[in-house]
Amino acid sequence: MEPKRKSGSLAKHDLPQFYLLIMLYLAQGIPVGLAFGTVPFLLKSLAKETSFTSLGIFSMATYPYSLKIIWSPIVDSLYNKRIGRRRSWIIPVQFVSGFVLWALGWCISQGIIFDGVDDAFHNRGNGTLHSVSIKNLTWWFGLLVFLCATQDIAVDGWALTILSKESLSYASTAQTIGLNIGYFMSFTIFLSLNSSDFANKYFRNIPLDHGFISLGGYMKFSGMLYIVITIYIIFCTKEKPYVEYLPKVEPINTSDGGSKPISIEYDDGDVVSTQNTSSIKYIYRCFIKVLKLKSVRSLAFIHMISKFAFQCNEAATNLKLLEQGFKREDLAVTVLIDLPFEIIFGYYVVKWSSDKDPMIRDNRRLRNSTGTNKVIKFLVGDAGVLTPWLWGFLGRLAAAVLGSYVVKQFPKDGEISTGYFCLVIFQHLLGSFMNTVQFIGISAFHTRVADPVLGGTYMTLLNTLSNFGGTWPRLIIMSMINYFTVYQCTIPGTNKVYVTHGGSMQACTELLNGTVTILRDGYYITNLICIVVGLFLYFGYLKRKILHLQSLPISSWRCT
């Protein structure tokens, strides 16, 4: 008899598909890292007078990633049967994405877009920005994120069928590993290798004015990587490696143009029912049914409000450190340290999120046998599938509190001590790790409750709500920081002093050649508001509702 596989472990026959998903999510993480991290970083570090409102406007480039549900049913229903439902979209979208990345990289290298960011690499200047058009940057990177979001719809749907049922929970692990590696490549690793200070300090005997990799060069390399991955998908993959149809049955047409259900059998013996998923009308009708489910509406509301509590910390803390003089290559190192932790512990968070895993049962017994039961129950309630999400929420709140302390304690003389550097590392490690705990926990829950019949549409709906919950507050948060901040502008050679409430530093430094002094920093006020709102939301609503949702049967999430 074949030895029984351990509960919760990845099946060996699913390893090729698992690695393929990692590569697809890695490719997706490249433009995400550029739009969400690198470009705002470069804008703030190369032009410190860039206002937080301008950064908030650029954040609109990330909106397609949060609005992809609008065209998700189209991606789910229109496809070439010979190529496959998911490959029909992944292949052309990745080809176009690769071309756009390469073309955008070429334009940046030539100074046509993002003028000045690569000047030091081409002997055109010292690397300072030249009147960058935030509007143009937003449009170009918005296009890139739109393509990335479309690819994400297809990959999320593919993850539901490319893995066997026994390994389905590892789709969220592949997503976490791939997205993190791609994000770190485009954000942390790129910023380190792009920095002249980093290269001169650690690798060069003779200092130069530029780092190892330019932004344009990196984007052209990323475009070629997209093409290589796409060629592999064309020639080396199948749409359904472990899914076989039962004996062929001709669909029976119904009055509404659809078809009666057909059974699909997976290799692991699970049988699900499907209909004519090539009908856009059918997919949209099912989509509306899903939105009407009480459980989905409750989860949607949670997604829309839960991330407000951390937005100031995660969007502005690193930028405030840059503004005060923290070197971007040092900040990149703090982010780099986090990568192995997220990959290693991601596996255990998946097991933690499985209600079939012994870890949860052991956790329940531990609560009943220790004196910490009351404290734990007060904080996260009874153990369940979403317990990691609850702990992650509290951990990110703690990281937000620590973020204000880290910015406040920045050395007045600008000299970074080892102790302070370790404090920055710890704060970032806490925040990003707890973010990963929440992400894997909720992704595993999404995979568990999503209806395989709807494939990418259902997963995209849940993931879109989660993403948009972290996107919509960002412009508001950035505007709040600007509004609550009071600047003093001193004009040299005169006795004139202007006090601006919620104004722009750029007007003072560029138009008046003045010196800016911050009298009141709106970052602290905004972060405090977010934390207080988060505490009220968690103990007043979120914890209670999450405990209810995780106890619902799978039938509460299905419309087919």
UniProtKB/Swiss-Prot annotation:
Cellular component terms per the entry's GO annotation: membrane
List UniProt keywords, sorted A-Z.
Membrane, Transmembrane, Transmembrane helix, Transport
The residues on the Cytoplasmic side of the membrane are 1-17, 76-88, 161-172, 236-329, 396-421, 543-560
For the keyword Transmembrane, the answer is yes
Q: Which InterPro entries match?
A: AcetylCoA_trans_1-like, AmpG_permease/AT-1, MFS_trans_sf
Q: Which residues lie on this side of the membrane: Extracellular?
A: 39-54, 110-139, 194-214, 351-374, 443-521
Q: Name one GO molecular function term.
A: acetyl-CoA transmembrane transporter activity
Matches recorded under SUPFAM superfamilies: MFS general substrate transporter
A GO BP term here is: acetyl-CoA transmembrane transport
Task: Spell out the subcellular localization from the entry.
Answer: Membrane
Residues annotated as transmembrane: 18-38, 55-75, 89-109, 140-160, 173-193, 215-235, 330-350, 375-395, 422-442, 522-542
Q: Output this protein's name.
A: Uncharacterized membrane protein YBR220C
Q: State the organism named in the record.
A: Saccharomyces cerevisiae (strain ATCC 204508 / S288c)
